[in-house]
Design a protein with these regions (language model features):
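Charged alpha-helical initiation segments
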Residues: 1-53, 154-192
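Short, solvent-exposed segments of well-ordered alpha helices
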Residues: 5, 46-63, 120-128, 152, ...
């Protein structure tokens, strides 16, 4: 793994996808139904349609990137429970947190307890939301599973998981490396 490339290119790209998904999910949760939408590029109308043409793919991409980041940090799901990956069970070509080195040595895998502690008011809820989001990315998006579609994840759980994932990266990657997270490249304005 090329650590500098991962930290300077791929990690910010994944975090941008999460930030955009969080923003879109917050908007979508405010709307009772899809709204009409126009997208302008360089002050010219380029796309017209319903909000779902943008929000749905943005959310799906965010869930997939969250799954990848959680796996990068050493978290996975076994029998519906968030658990820590066994370090030597990971493939040699996987991008993993323990391949990054800070001033005090290699970074450590994140434990489920550390992941839950990001949300001190409900650590178990945070762990459950993360587990559900990993499963959603795997069984609902990367693969098609009939059992998943009978019980999809609630929007509130996905929102919590996306936000917790961002905070985990900040706390367990950027902070130990003495780096700042790059700024989010999108702004939104409230509707009038």
């Amino acid at each position: 793994m090329n650590s500098e490339d991962y930290l300077n290119r791929l990690l910010p790209h994944r975090l941008d996808a999460l930030a955009i998904a969080v923003l879109m999910l917050k908007f979508r949760m405010q709307w009772e139904e899809p709204k009409s939408m126009q997208i302008y590029v360089d002050h010219r109308l380029q796309f017209e349609g319903m909000t779902t043409m943008f929000t749905n793919p943005a959310l799906e991409v965010g869930v997939l990137h969250a799954r990848a980041l959680l796996e990068f940090m050493g978290l996975k799901v076994v029998s519906g429970i968030l658990v820590q990956a066994v370090p030597n069970s990971r493939r040699s070509d996987d991008a993993t947190i323990e391949k990054l080195t800070g001033p005090t040595g290699p970074l450590s895998l994140v434990t489920p307890e550390e992941a839950g502690a990001i949300n001190p008011s409900d650590p178990e809820g945070a762990k459950q939301a993360l587990a559900q989001t990993i499963v959603a990315g795997h069984k609902g998006l990367a693969h098609s599973s009939a059992t998943y579609f009978s019980k999809p994840v609630q929007a509130e759980s996905i929102l919590l998981a996306l936000q917790v994932t961002q905070q985990l990266i900040e706390r367990y990657v950027y902070l130990p490396l003495g780096r700042q997270r790059p700024p989010v490249p999108i702004e939104a304005r409230p509707r009038e």
